[in-house]
Regions:
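Metal-dependent peptidase/peptidase-like ectodomains
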Residues: 135-136, 145-244, 248-249
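Structural recognition of the beta-strand scaffold that forms the well-ordered cores
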Residues: 16-20, 45-48, 83-86, 98-102, ...
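Extracellular/luminal Protease-associated
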Residues: 1-44, 216
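His/Asp/Glu-rich mid-to-C-terminal helical/loop segments that flank catalytic regions of hydrolases
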Residues: 249-302
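Soluble metallo-hydrolase cores and metallopeptidase-like ectodomains found primarily
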Residues: 34-114, 129, 133, 137-139
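Solvent-exposed loop/turn segments at secondary-structure junctions
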Residues: 22-27, 51-53, 75-77, 91, ...
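Active-site alpha-helical elements of protease catalytic centers
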Residues: 8, 12, 114-127
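Second-shell loop/turn segments in exported
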Residues: 1-6, 41-46, 71-73, 107-117, ...
Length: 302
């Protein structure tokens, strides 16, 4: 109960309170957080990440005292945006089938978001570049969703804005989220569906792995990303993520310790080799899906 901790500090004459989180909800280090106090306090209260709290403690231990400068701001009525680019086939009628390549471009407070999810957004941009001159009879949509971290708001809004006719046009969604970590225990590139069932997208990913002689590509069950709203309305979709799974029932898995923390930066948490592998697997899966006849893809989706 943070309220009690803050009240105790106030009673002892504290001018401010720095709380810090030891561990996150997924085995990661504690992240910067909102203390969400239910009682109004007369002093400033901040929620620090584990790394920030430790650094502050070390500074105090060395010097006995230190000066910490913090800025607080209140924001309301914020707007989130989805960034959407479409590559239409020549002589488009507007009714062609479509393949979606997606990611989210937001991070959480206090985290640079190199792997979560600049890696996914970078992948979408690179595949947009790679496919710019590829002729197909299908539309390709490259989408960067906003506000994934606050509850899949961007993708949920997008899916809810589609008519049933528009939903039926989408053959599959390749959603990249955390595709470049260097964490050794996150040893496989998974194509995840919310219910664990295979679909057109996971089939394409596994086939791509075979074509590339890559045995690190596996299928699994996981939600918590922008593939979920699509799956909920029957559109084949999968999350691509580096993860290690020890057990599915109960679910015991590994993602990087620096997930959602200040250490999720390019220097500490990015593997160019894994990024390249994700690009190759997802790019090959997308290409193969685009090359299939509409009849083939509809049969796989059924």
């Amino acid at each position: 109960d943070y309220n009690k901790q803050v009240e105790n500090a106030v009673s002892k004459g504290a001018k401010g309170v720095l709380l810090y989180s030891l561990i996150g909800g997924r085995g990661n280090y504690g992240q910067t957080f909102n203390p969400r106090l239910t009682k109004k306090q007369s002093i400033p209260v901040f929620g620090l990440a584990y790394a920030q709290g430790n650094a502050f403690k070390e500074e105090i231990a060395k010097k006995g005292t230190t000066i910490l400068s913090l800025k607080a701001r209140h924001e309301s009525n914020l707007t989130s945006l989805n960034v959407i680019a479409k590559k239409k086939p020549k002589n488009s009628t507007g009714n062609e089938k479509a393949v979606v390549v997606s990611s989210h471009y937001d991070s959480v407070v206090g985290a640079p978001g190199a792997n979560d999810n600049a890696s996914g957004t970078g992948l979408v941009l690179e595949l947009a570049r790679a496919f710019q001159n590829v002729e197909t009879d299908k539309e390709i949509r490259f989408i960067a969703f906003g506000s994934e971290e606050t509850g899949l708001l961007g993708s949920d809004y997008y899916v809810n804005s589609l008519s049933q006719k528009e939903r039926d046009r989408i053959l599959g969604v390749f959603n990249a989220d955390m595709v470049a970590t260097n964490y050794d225990k996150a040893k496989n590139l998974y194509a995840m569906t919310p219910n664990g069932s295979p679909n057109l997208v996971t089939d394409a990913a596994l086939q791509a792995g075979k074509q590339l002689n890559n045995d690190l590509v596996l299928q699994g069950k996981f939600g918590s990303s922008d593939h979920v709203p699509f799956a909920e309305v029957g559109i084949p979709a999968a999350l691509f993520i580096w993860m290690g799974v020890d057990s599915w029932n109960p679910l015991i898995y590994h993602i990087e310790k620096v997930y959602h923390t200040p250490q999720d930066n390019v220097f500490e948490n990015i593997s160019p080799e894994r990024m390249k592998m994700a690009l190759e697997v997802i790019g090959t899966g997308v290409y193969n899906t685009l090359q299939q006849s509409v009849t083939q893809t509809e049969q796989k989706a059924a």
